[in-house]
């Protein structure tokens, strides 16, 4: 039905289909003058303005015309197809997840819903009989009681609540229950540091607990295993025995699933887990918790409860501190009401302080002028007894700079100083004497003794843990941290201070999102200790009340899938018998979220089709044919315009005084006069070539309002009833919608307003002289364009115009009315078509094309056969999950590692695991530069194969993802240098070096396994030697939590 408006009828010339270029421009040869695009003359005109009138009444068919009057069935009359299409689309219901959601009850600010398979009836939860698996010394909150009841009934539950609300209670209960029933339980967390802390907590509570993080394995046969999600994923792919005995899996911080890089691991894991396992998901507040539960229910055919609460045990007060001011403004009170008047006062202070505030930023090089704002606030917090405070900054450098400004202050008593020293010396006791003298270790102690701490990724892990312990013991009163501190670790303070409301997210500076603000500000207010938490936001540039309100009162970020394919995933799924990569795509949360849109689209199609059928057009066939002719003319007009706009044709005619018509999207300026034109070169973003841009300066009638505020580029046309002001506006060539054959005389000096306005009078004179519209330059006769393509288009135009004039409708008095109806109906047809495309897309599994491309790459590189059977190379790549498995496998099979020493191989592998940016590129010696070049050659080959397989890949970006910045550092460390020595070789933070080394050790272990898989003992021993070379001293000092 909808394709009734296609143009396949209109191949006017045999074997030459009309080129689809666009809409709306046509032309007519009239008395030898090219009269320009439709609509350019007044309605009365004899020019094509939607309809052409012509003296020609030749009804005889032109040879070249297609005799289509009889072949075209009534476009709108294909009723049956409509009905069929709807029913066909409704069969999508089979695809739709069959899940229903039942609301259970809502008690004391906590909602409880359950998602269950559509064919099951909801059975109310049974109250517990007998003793609880674990007793608590305090009264449980409503949401904790509800969640525990789900666990007692052996049903999965997602608990979504604020950080300090006490979600861990629900997890502990599930562990206690599993241990009592002699079942195994797995607790997974997103980061190793968090796993270590959780292990510590669980071990103190239950004893029968083990830990597996890739770095460390403790008691792997325990009934309760704490592990990172990556380890669980690889256990599932390996078909580990452990999985057979597991009854419960607890996912901590499930909102981490939206992490663009590692979130996919959660999804894979949840999909791979067997249906008989039950789950406890702990999450920060997410608005779409119910959707997640529906997915779990759809995936594992079991009910999944959602317990959601916005409750905060300690309410928060939010203040703004405007830079340059000296006081706090309460903008959200403890009841959660936004106080707009206070917000506006704060912004007023900011405006008044204006330039003063700008000068107060700390200089990166020198000190700051006088005490900084941060210093003022922290001092005030201490005086008012609002400590402990966490001060969040968005860069490691800022953290340290602010902390160093505090050195004049001292928040600890002598007693506390002694304790700090004792904890500190015990913590670093395991380090060698040399490592104890590292600058970072020596510098941090004096700060800690004063009750000031620093916490960011660049710190040595052992210092980071020491600081966490001191903070939780109340020995640090002011902690300067980056946002990673807000991840998971339950270490609340009384006050949270943001040093800035903007952050750099790798691409640009932006306001922090309300979700990030909620996560970080949630650290304020300690349960049972503070009656309220205090959050202070420092603002140094004006924000509108809308942005302010959105930030301070916005909702949490939804949990959206970050699922994407990886080669390791595809290969592992090809290796495992009972599951394939297609299954993984179909079952992903990504696909599920996509399916949820289907009912809306079906509804849209239905409504549009009803509207469509309501529009009745008399003599429909004939009207549609006429409509199509006009559409076709419009399209051809656009093509002609494209020829005219080619700089080589139009530039010679853009002399000063030439009348041109300017139209920019919705803004139609009408006729103006060319003043000048210039050529600007524009660098193309991807190729770096110069692309000349031609800018024409045109004198146009603009609205005075639009000229007030900014550059002339922002000028808007004057409204019909307004006099407007003539102004010279720079216009890109393609915005000229018509070029006239008329030229006017323009005054030499256009600065005086009167001179400019005089030109407007001249233009109006010309318009009076040509009531049928100002004559345009004829592309062939005037502009002398000899292009064969253009001649063809003009021939087609003549044929169509002839056809239009001879159409019975053309001179019909009701033409406009029926034509408008026809246009409306055609638009609905287009909408239906696009909605159906949407439906079709909704049925297809997303990313399936990418999967095909990836399989193509695997076949071409010899990792798998054409029938998806995994080859030797593929089995090797399955062993490597923490770095680029394709490239490493290729390097191994090409013998790239064979001639390298263990130290060289280790240094080369560091490129795969170092992820930060370093400003300086090390000067590499040939023994490192050689292997690096070979690796890059190998990577280029993979990029080439990927591009040939139609994968979107940019060779530059791909190559730059391997960062050689620490190669020399790792090489020197592997040859036995001290940590102090390698720190001096680079500007990378100590903590980042250690993180790189620990990742490297994990990769080396995987490389050992990979070498073992091909039976290359020599290579296996080389990688193992690499491990022993780097695994020493402070780099691998054990975590204090273990």
Curated annotation (Swiss-Prot):
The keyword Metal-binding does not apply. Residues 16-74 are annotated as: Disordered. GO terms for cellular component: catalytic step 2 spliceosome; nuclear speck; nucleolus; nucleoplasm; nucleus; TRAMP complex. Changing residue 658 to A: Decreased interaction with NRDE2. ATP binds at residues 139, 161-168. PROSITE patterns: HELICASE_ATP_BIND_1, HELICASE_CTER. Pfam families: DEAD, DSHCT, Helicase_C, MTR4-like_stalk, MTR4_beta-barrel. Residues 148-304 form the Helicase ATP-binding domain. It comes from the Eukaryota. InterPro entries: DEAD/DEAH_box_helicase_dom, Helicase_ATP-bd, Helicase_C-like, MTR4-like_stalk, MTR4_beta-barrel, P-loop_NTPase, RNA-DNA_Helicase, SKI2-like. A motif (DEIH box) lies at residues 252-255. It is an enzyme of class 3 (hydrolase). There is a cross-link at residues 24, 358, 684, 723 (Glycyl lysine isopeptide (Lys-Gly) (interchain with G-Cter in SUMO2)). The modification Phosphoserine is found at residue 40. Component of a TRAMP-like complex, an ATP-dependent exosome regulatory complex consisting of a helicase (MTREX), an oligadenylate polymerase (TENT4B or TENT4A), and a substrate specific RNA-binding factor (ZCCHC7 or ZCCHC8). Several TRAMP-like complexes exist with specific compositions and are associated with nuclear, or nucleolar RNA exosomes. Identified in the spliceosome C complex. Component of the poly(A) tail exosome targeting (PAXT) complex made of PABPN1, ZFC3H1 and MTREX that directs a subset of long and polyadenylated poly(A) RNAs for exosomal degradation. Belongs to the helicase family. SKI2 subfamily. This is Exosome RNA helicase MTR4. It comes from Homo sapiens. The gene is MTREX.
């Amino acid at each position: 039905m909808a394709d009734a408006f296609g143009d396949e009828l209109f191949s006017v010339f045999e074997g030459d289909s009309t080129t689809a270029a666009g809409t709306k421009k046509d032309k007519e040869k009239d008395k030898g003058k090219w009269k320009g695009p439709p609509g350019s003359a007044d309605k009365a005109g004899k020019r094509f303005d939607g309809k052409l009138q012509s003296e020609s009444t030749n009804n005889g068919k032109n040879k070249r015309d297609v005799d289509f009057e009889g072949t075209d069935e009534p476009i709108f009359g294909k009723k049956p197809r409509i009905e069929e299409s709807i029913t066909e689309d409704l069969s999508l219901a089979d695809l739709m997840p069959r899940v229903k959601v039942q609301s259970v009850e809502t008690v004391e600010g906590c909602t409880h819903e359950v998602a269950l398979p559509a064919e099951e009836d909801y059975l109310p939860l049974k109250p517990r009989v007998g003793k609880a698996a674990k007793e608590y010394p305090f009264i449980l909150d409503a949401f904790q009681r509800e969640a525990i009841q789900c666990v007692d009934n052996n049903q999965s539950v997602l608990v979504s609540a604020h950080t300090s609300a006490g979600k861990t209670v629900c997890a502990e209960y599930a562990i206690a229950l599993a241990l009592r029933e002699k079942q195994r339980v797995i607790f997974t967390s997103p980061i190793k540091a968090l796993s270590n802390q959780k292990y510590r907590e669980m071990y103190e509570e239950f004893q029968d607990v083990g830990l597996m993080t890739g770095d460390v394995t403790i008691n792997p046969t325990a009934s309760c295993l704490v592990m990172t999600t990556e380890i669980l994923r690889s256990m599932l792919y390996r078909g580990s025995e452990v999985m057979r005995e597991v009854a419960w899996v607890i996912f901590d911080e499930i909102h981490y699933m939206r992490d663009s890089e590692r979130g996919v691991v959660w999804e894979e894991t949840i999909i791979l887990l067997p249906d008989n396992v039950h789950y406890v998901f702990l999450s920060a507040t997410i608005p779409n918790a119910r959707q997640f539960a529906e997915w779990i229910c759809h995936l594992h055919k079991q009910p999944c409860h959602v317990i959601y609460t916005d409750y905060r045990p300690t309410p928060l007060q939010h203040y703004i501190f405007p830079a340059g001011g000296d006081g706090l403004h309460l903008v959200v009170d403890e009841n959660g009401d936004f106080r707009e008047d206070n917000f506006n006062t704060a912004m007023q202070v900011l405006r008044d302080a204006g330039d003063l505030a700008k000068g107060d930023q700390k200089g990166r090089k020198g000190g700051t002028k006088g005490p900084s704002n941060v210093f003022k606030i922290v001092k005030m917090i201490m005086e008012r007894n609002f400590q402990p405070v966490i001060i969040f900054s968005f860069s490691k450098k800022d953290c340290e700079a602010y902390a160093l400004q505090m050195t004049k202050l001292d928040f600890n008593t002598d007693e506390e100083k002694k304790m700090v020293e004792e904890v500190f010396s015990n913590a670093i006791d395991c380090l060698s004497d040399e490592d104890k003298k590292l600058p970072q270790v020596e510098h941090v102690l004096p700060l800690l003794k004063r009750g000031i701490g620093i916490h960011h990724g660049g710190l040595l892990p052992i210092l980071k843990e020491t600081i966490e312990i001191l903070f939780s013991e109340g020995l640090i009163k002011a902690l300067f941290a980056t946002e990673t501190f807000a991840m998971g670790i339950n270490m609340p303070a009384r006050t949270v201070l943001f040093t800035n409301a903007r952050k750099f997210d790798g691409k640009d500076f932006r306001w922090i999102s309300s979700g990030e603000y909620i996560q970080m500000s949630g650290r304020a207010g300690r349960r049972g200790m503070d009656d309220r938490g205090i959050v202070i936001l420092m603002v140094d540039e004006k924000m509108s009340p809308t942005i302010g309100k959105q930030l301070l009162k916005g909702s949490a970020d939804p949990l959206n899938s970050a699922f994407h394919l990886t080669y390791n995933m595809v290969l592992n799924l090809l290796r495992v018998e009972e599951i394939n990569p297609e299954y993984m795509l179909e079952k992903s949360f990504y696909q599920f979220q996509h399916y949820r849109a289907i009912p809306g689209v079906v509804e849209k199609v239905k409504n549009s089709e009803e509207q469509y059928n309501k529009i009745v057009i008399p003599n429909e066939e004939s009207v549609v044919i006429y409509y199509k002719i006009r559409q076709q003319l419009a399209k051809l007009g656009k093509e002609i315009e494209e020829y005219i706009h080619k700089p080589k044709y139009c530039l010679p005619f853009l002399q000063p005084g030439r009348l041109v018509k300017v139209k920019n999207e919705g803004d139609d300026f009408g006729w103006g006069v060319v003043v000048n034109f210039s050529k600007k070169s524009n660098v193309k973003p991807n190729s770096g070539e110069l692309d000349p841009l031609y800018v024409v300066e045109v004198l146009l009638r603009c609205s005075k309002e639009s000229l007030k505020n900014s550059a002339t580029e922002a000028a808007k046309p004057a409204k019909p009833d307004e006099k407007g002001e003539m102004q010279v506006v720079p216009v890109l060539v393609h915005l000229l919608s018509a070029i006239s054959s008329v030229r006017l005389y323009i005054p030499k000096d256009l600065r005086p307003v009167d001179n400019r306005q005089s030109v407007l009078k001249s233009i109006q004179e010309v318009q009076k002289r040509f009531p049928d519209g100002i004559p345009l330059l004829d592309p062939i006769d005037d502009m002398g364009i000899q292009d064969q393509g253009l001649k063809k288009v003009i021939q087609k135009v003549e044929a169509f115009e002839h056809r239009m004039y001879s159409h019975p409708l053309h001179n019909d008095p009701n033409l406009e009315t029926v034509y408008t109806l026809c246009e409306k109906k055609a638009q609905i047809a287009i909408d239906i078509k696009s909605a159906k495309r949407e439906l079709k897309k909704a049925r297809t599994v997303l990313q399936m094309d990418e999967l095909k491309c990836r399989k193509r790459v695997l076949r071409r590189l010899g990792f798998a056969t054409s029938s998806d059977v995994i080859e030797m190379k593929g089995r090797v790549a399955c062993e490597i999950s923490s770095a680029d498995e394709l490239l490493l496998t290729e390097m191994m099979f090409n013998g790239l590692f064979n001639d390298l020493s263990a130290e060289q191989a280790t240094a080369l592998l560091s490129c795969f695991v170092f992820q930060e940016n370093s400003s300086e590129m090390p000067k590499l010696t040939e023994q490192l530069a050689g292997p690096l070049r070979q690796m890059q050659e190998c990577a280029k080959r993979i990029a080439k194969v990927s591009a040939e397989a139609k994968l979107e890949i940019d060779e530059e970006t791909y190559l730059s993802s391997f960062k050689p910045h620490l190669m020399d550092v790792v090489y020197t460390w592997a040859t036995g240098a001290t940590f102090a020595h390698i720190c001096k070789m680079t500007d990378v933070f100590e903590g980042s070096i250690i993180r790189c080394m620990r990742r490297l050790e994990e990769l080396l272990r995987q490389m050992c396994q990979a070498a073992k898989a091909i039976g290359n003992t020599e290579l296996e021993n080389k990688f193992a030697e690499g491990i022993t070379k780097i695994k020493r001293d402070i780099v691998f000092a054990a975590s204090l939590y273990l």
